[in-house]
Each structure stands twice: as structure tokens, then as C-alpha cells.
């Protein structure tokens, strides 16, 4: 991780770290899919890539223009675009597309992305890894709220072990110090890198999926369900950074 520009929170990544990040994406995505399907073989797990530019209207109200990178509009008719602060809205849009296009896609459905996101983070030393441009690996795992399965609680220890197994630092699960409005509960996974316990992953039970899900039993009328989303959000840059700390010891 090189600060060549001499601008806090803007870094270059060299080939070794890029390959390591790619390895993390492969391993983590395989492990999450295996965990979900071991809990319920019906899970449909898919990957998608969405543009890093997105309509401003899709960004959560929790982000003001001072938090994100907004494109200047050249005319009043031009769609206001921003560099995405997270992958979730574009993943949700794809999930709605799948569920609404008569493709017989059903819940439970997990869609994940690995890619760059952008936020106007306050300038901090690089060791805190609060970057203005950063890599996220985010899984949105949607299921009916009345399913009776607590996938959030079931995911905590498998995800902690998964991360600890590759970063090779002590890892713990703690309640998040912030609870987003969209979440019933959020837990963080932190690793001890010798300088601090650093958050590398958050696991939330989200209630903000944009639509209800309609199932059609073999007999009787269709049933509308509320949708709950298990979100597993992993900071890939922080995983690479902490892996390098462990490897240097």
C-alpha cells in the first residue's frame, strides 16, 4: 500500500496485493456460498458487477453530498450521478430485476459484488485504512422474514473463522458502535494487528429491501412476504493490510 500521491487516503496497490485481494474474493465467496447452502440447500447464489457510477436518487438518505463524490450536472435534464458509496443499491436493483422478470427466480437469493466504492472520508494516516477509494466485498442474502431461520446469528462464527483463517491474526465479533437505520442488528468482526482492533467485516440484518416477495403455493392464493436481508460486508483493503502485518512478523 503506497501513498505515492502524498494525499491521505489515496493509495496505490502493487501486484502482490492485487493477487492477494483476488484470492480473498475467491475464497470468501466460496465459503459464504458453502455456509448458506449448508444451512439451506435452496439458496441461489450469484455474482454481479454494477457500474461504480450510479443515480443519486438510489443513494441512501444517510449520505449527504458532503459524504460522497457527486458529478456536476451540465444541464437540468441530465441524471445526477455519484460515485457509489456502497454496492448495496445496485445489488438490490439487480435482485429486483431477477425477481420481477418472470425468470422463476425465488428466495432465498444471495447476490454479491466485489468492487470499488468511494466516500469523502476525513484525512487520516494510512495505518487506519480509511480510504476515499476502497474495495468492498458485499453479500446481500435475501430471505422471507417469516422463514424461521436466523441466518444472521448463524453466520457470525463461520464468518469470523473464515477471516481469521486467512489473515492469521486474532479475530473477534463485537456489537457495532453504530446501528444504521436499515439494520435490526449489526455485528463487526475485528482483527488485532498489534496497533489496534480493526474492523474488517460487518454483518447486518437489513430490513430495507425495496419490495415484498410474492410466493405462489401449489394450492390457494399467492402470499406476500416481508423480506429480510443478511448482509456480509468485507473490507478487502483492510484484509490485505492486516494480512501483510501478520506476514511480516
Residue ranges and their predicted role:
Residues 1-249:
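TRNA-recognition modules of translation machinery and tRNA-sensing kinases, especially anticodon-binding
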Amino acid at each position: 500500500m503506497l501513498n505515492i500521491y502524498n494525499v491521505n487516503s489515496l493509495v496505490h496497490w502493487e501486484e502482490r496485493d492485487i493477487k492477494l485481494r483476488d484470492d480473498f474474493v475467491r475464497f470468501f465467496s466460496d465459503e459464504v456460498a458453502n455456509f448458506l447452502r449448508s444451512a439451506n440447500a435452496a439458496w441461489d447464489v450469484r455474482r454481479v458487477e454494477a457500474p461504480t457510477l450510479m443515480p443519486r436518487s438510489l443513494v441512501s438518505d444517510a449520505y449527504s453530498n458532503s459524504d460522497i463524490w457527486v458529478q456536476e450536472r451540465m444541464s437540468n435534464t441530465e441524471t445526477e450521478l455519484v460515485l457509489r458509496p456502497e454496492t448495496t443499491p445496485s445489488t438490490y436493483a439487480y435482485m429486483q430485476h431477477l425477481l420481477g422478470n418472470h425468470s422463476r427466480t425465488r428466495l432465498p437469493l444471495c447476490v454479491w459484488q466485489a468492487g470499488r466504492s468511494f466516500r469523502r472520508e476525513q484525512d487520516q494516516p494510512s495505518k487506519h485504512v480509511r480510504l476515499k477509494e476502497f474495495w468492498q466485498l458485499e453479500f446481500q442474502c435475501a430471505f422471507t422474514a417469516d422463514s424461521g431461520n436466523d441466518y444472521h446469528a448463524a453466520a457470525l462464527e463461520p464468518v469470523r473463522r473464515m477471516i481469521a483463517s486467512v489473515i492469521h491474526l486474532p479475530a473477534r465479533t463485537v456489537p457495532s458502535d453504530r446501528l444504521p437505520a436499515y439494520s435490526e442488528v449489526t455485528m463487526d468482526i475485528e482483527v488485532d494487528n498489534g496497533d489496534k482492533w480493526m474492523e474488517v467485516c460487518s454483518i447486518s440484518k437489513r430490513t430495507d429491501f425495496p419490495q415484498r416477495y410474492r410466493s405462489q403455493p401449489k394450492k390457494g392464493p399467492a402470499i406476500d412476504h416481508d423480506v429480510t436481508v443478511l448482509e456480509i460486508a468485507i473490507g478487502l483493503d483492510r484484509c490485505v493490510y492486516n494480512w501483510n502485518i501478520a506476514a511480516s512478523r
